[in-house]
Amino acid sequence: MRVYQFCRPFQLFTCFLCYLLVFVKANKEKISQKNYQVCAGMYSKEDWKGKIDPFISFNLKKISGLSDESDPGLVVAIYDFQDFEHLGVQLPDEEMYYICDDYAIDIGICEEENRDEFIVQDVVYDPYTSTNRSLANPIMTFSQNEVGLHDTRYPIKETGFYCVTAFRSSTSTKFNAVVNFRNAYGQLAGTEINKLPLYGLLAVAYVVAMALYSFAFWKHKHELLPLQKYLLAFFVFLTAETIFVWAYYDLKNEKGDTAGIKVYMVFLSILTAGKVTFSFFLLLIIALGYGIVYPKLNKTLMRRCQMYGALTYAICIGFLIQSYLTDMEAPSPLILITLIPMALALIIFYYMIIRSMTKTVIYLKEQRQIVKLNMYKKLLYIIYASFLSVLAGSIVSSFIYVGMNTIDMIEKNWRSRFFVTDFWPTLVYFIVFVTIAFLWRPTDTSYMLAASQQLPTDPENVADFDLGDLQSFDDQDDASIITGERGIDEDDLNLNFTDDEEGHDNVNNHSQGHGPVSPSPTK
């Protein structure tokens, strides 16, 4: 019994739209009787230089259930996506007939020499442009019923989005095949090759930014805040992580999707989980006033932040491991076991950051700590701007394709899709982190700002504070304030996520006398 001979006009196109969500991210892709179509972006040798001529090959790994020796097994078509409308012929009853068999030959819609191949029309009517349309590139079609690599490769002469479709001749036939989308430059898929130079440039940018921050760190090494040490350590981590990402794409382009590359990918995912988790953790302790509003956080509160960060990190790792163990061709709802907790953990993290940041800003405003208040306002603006930037990237990309018809959009989307979904958020993250690090960088005054009380803006209270207070710290006083070893009342730093434990009400509104400032929470 022949199958897939008839099909409604929109069904084949619907399949392509579905596959846009999971199109090839490597140069080789498996297809079977369940997933019989796959597409990938391909570059011509003129557009992206390389050692070989780009091609698409079809390798049948397994086939069973053939009805007899004359059974053609599989009927395969390799073509440019924009030519998909040229496949098949519409019958008088408006059904589409795709395969050239006895029936198709009898009614005259194909020739005997094209038996057991896809029916291809050289000119078709394009409903999107309301014009007749010719083939943009040749369509290669053949049948195969034996295991092995097909002896003819499909050459890529023009950059485009190419597809492979394999129809089985009977419902009992089962098969597995591998399609190799081989570009001239190496093993990377066309959708990923642009990441190689971009992540290389990003790694260089991280190195330069880290060097500048490290210079400021070294220059003021005797006037450092614990927060600035956190920032430098995270700078080193982010720089190394970006270099590892660039190295991953470079190795994958040279070696292909090997077992070692898969292990490397898992390693990168673990680093990414650490990047996300520590970013939230760092923002949380900054939002709580660590290093600027308070010399240090209460040990219990800091331990809670660290434990929650570790829990979130473990959940992210669990999700990534499960996602790698899950068959993407047959996704399971069991992935929700780790996906939902991860989403909830990050949402809670975000809520705590915004809530703590808002309370800190209100507190600084009430205490009229203008310099510190401006720092935290800038941080809030940076956070909001980052969200708007990511959102703007998606909106702009959507508007770019609004004026295109569906085929043109698909033909061009694969080249730039990675930038919106992958690299643009990474670039925004880099800009945000560097901006925050610059805002909290070591300076001649940053240490004194964190360990001193600011002159009140209320004229009635000016006499309560003297600028000589800032100059009364000796080295021992400075160390005691930062380490918390001198005169710290546990209640003064008893910060928590509740209103009563936030710690803002425990701060002295004015300094008393002209001695060293008490190591209670500073303003």
Curated annotation (Swiss-Prot):
The modification Phosphoserine is found at S480. It is a multi-pass membrane protein. The modification Phosphothreonine is found at T483, T498. Pfam families: GOST_TM, PTM1-like_N. GO terms for biological process: retrograde transport, endosome to Golgi. Coiled coil: none annotated. Residues 488-503 have a biased composition (Acidic residues). Belongs to the LU7TM family. This is Membrane protein PTM1. It comes from Saccharomyces cerevisiae (strain ATCC 204508 / S288c) (Baker's yeast). The lineage of its organism: Eukaryota, Fungi, Dikarya, Ascomycota, Saccharomycotina.
